[in-house]
């Protein structure tokens, strides 16, 4: 088998990386034409590595060396003499990513696209070409199911379980007064839904909102802007447990503390 490794540079990753290389000693490390991609790190590294790294039909394996591991199926303790046989017996599936399109660019999002504005700049939201609302506030989040345990959760969005492929929109600190009232609650939309944000050119460039795709700032000019969103199937295949119990266990170990 041919493989490629992406590893974070944290101290705790290095021994796991060495262990993985030893386990894969009968496989061939290559730069192109690989069948497996191994990503070593936490969820943040996984997202930054693979959100726009979408190789055709390669199998992506996450190995957690960080604190949170919603995108990873293994940790260093799993890298034993049985690892390869377990790995080749697992089912890998394509997942839904959020495709983001602007006038000149198209890219994929695993967690969320975040819009921030410090001037409560108006953003018109359209759902399947129907005007939903004119939002004013601190910003907006939009993302697929996979992002519901990331920034969306911190913003009081819904935690969405596996096998529920939807798009979620969350308002951040909406501006409210008698003539400006928005939905305020998170919106959950079916996977086929097309969403569009329309923003007019600002009088001053510094008033124009800032846009971040999985934490990376986008270079969007101060001009009339339309950004569209829709779920698309990844080209890569991923292994992550879709069992309810496994997801509940991760949620409880990460977020829920009770005596």
From Swiss-Prot:
Tell me one GO biological process term: NADP biosynthetic process
Q: Which reaction does it catalyse?
A: NAD(+) + ATP = ADP + NADP(+) + H(+)
Task: Name where it mostly resides.
Answer: cytoplasm
> Keywords assigned by UniProt?
ATP-binding, Cytoplasm, Kinase, NAD, NADP, Nucleotide-binding, Transferase
Active site residues according to the UniProt entry: 43
Q: What class of enzyme is it?
A: transferase
Under the heading HAMAP family, the entry gives:
NAD_kinase (MF_00361)
- What role is this protein assigned? Involved in the regulation of the intracellular balance of NAD and NADP, and is a key enzyme in the biosynthesis of NADP. Catalyzes specifically the phosphorylation on 2'-hydroxyl of the adenosine moiety of NAD to yield NADP.
State the similarity comment: Belongs to the NAD kinase family.
Query: What protein does this entry describe?
Result: NAD kinase
Q: Which organism encodes this protein?
A: Mycoplasma genitalium (strain ATCC 33530 / DSM 19775 / NCTC 10195 / G37) (Mycoplasmoides genitalium)
* Gene transcribed to yield this protein: nadK
